[in-house]
């Protein structure tokens, strides 16, 4: 069985293929570092990190790009609230905490980690191209993408443009200037004192979605294999990305697979700073080992919404301890023994089924139980360790955050 992944675009699970043989190009939407990151962010990045590790283990050279949205409304708002504190200072402080959290969770560092403010030139170039091609228009220094000029707008969400017009649109800024309700900003004029850059349309700053398009194309080219992000980004952000990327570059599809992780809530309620219910990964890692938190996150299917309840990690302690202890059984033995090959094959079969990490962990749980009961072989112990390493567990010898290309292991 070959790897099959579910793509939001088309609502189907199909065989994973890439633009360039043997190479997988992944772009995952990163954070806006106006505040510290919470458990929901950790859920997303651990899931995509594990997929990246699996692709490497089966022979792909993975080019993984994750951006930083370091200029947007939220960054400006926080700067104002903090008495005009410089945005780069806010960004660097929160980004440092974020990177440290992911390092402790053994998340591999991206192949490229671009900041939006480093790509203003490319953003302006894409915007100018979209105007030239008739997909964008200028109104008093603001530049809008005209959604109706892209006939497939709505395809990612499986609806027509008319149906999307009935939805609440988070990109409703400057509505009085728009030709159509779904049109969105590519470039915008700014209030006095806010960060701005020179452009053919006057001083301003980028819109939200064009930033990701410019960074993805700059680092991975006009076509990629996997675009990842939270399910809350499907509309309008990812819908906009498809439209502007394919219209600007002339290449399609922009991404072969669109993968969206579910939302992690706190006891049924969305985590948000305004509600004061953020669960911070760094706080949990003061009480529990980072690998135990990683196990908790991978015990939920990446596409499913999940609820975090206080006490969940504590209840996971026995399972974590069993896997950790069993992974030391038969150390140094060859996983090529028949029992080891069988375990690896069963593990791969579950991951190949739309990256089903929870079922893969069940398979490894069963192997751990056999080993601890004295019914497993040394080869199975080594195979267990290899599989746990592919899932990114440091206790099993997984490569650390600073590792580059991992190479084949399974």
Placement of each model-derived feature along the sequence:
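Alpha-helical recognition segments enriched in aromatics with Gly/Pro capping
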Residues: 1-34, 49, 121-329
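Structural signal for well-ordered, non-membrane alpha-helices
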Residues: 52, 56, 99-102, 131, ...
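Short, glycine/charge-rich beta-strand/loop segments that flank catalytic centers
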Residues: 68-73, 95-98, 108-123, 141-150
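The substrate-binding groove and active-site-proximal loops of carbohydrate-active enzymes
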Residues: 78-87, 111-117, 230
